[in-house]
Amino acid sequence: MKTTRLYLSNDTSSRAAGAGRLADAWSERPEIQLIRTSSRGAFFLEPMVERDTPSGREAWFNVAPDDLPRIVDAVGGTPVAGIPFLQQQTRFTFANFGITEPLALDEYQTHGGLKGFEAAQSLSPEAIIEELRISRLRGRGGAAFPVWKKWQVAQQTESEQKYVVANADEGDAGTYC
């Protein structure tokens, strides 16, 4: 029997929308291999299931457990590249969301993960801060404070002991995708 790989997100918002229920219902199905991924952020479409087809990755929206046969048969899917919500975005940090398993280091590396880290190891602290400045990367909070400025202030603070504080508030559902 041929096994079909299905991709189903495993973050808090997707689970709240029913992804966990699908995973439970399909966990022992021999015709599929269920890959748990991070979400693409289109929570209004969750639970969303994806699979690879000869014409590319396709998705099924608001899926129920009894939708499995049509997904395995690739009937009624929507090309992921054609989802309007995703077409409006250029993803950098979240480029692999919905594609890789978030906690699988080997998958992360296969998709280019750690290249930035490896490159940064040869840079000076000042060069890293300059790269952050050029990137225009900002915090995701309401102030959208420039990341480079935070790092520069930490670097320039005269102290033998420094602290980095991360705001670990998940007030926005799914923040820690």
Region spans (language model):
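Feature of Fe-S/electron-transfer and energy-metabolism proteins
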Residues: 1-177
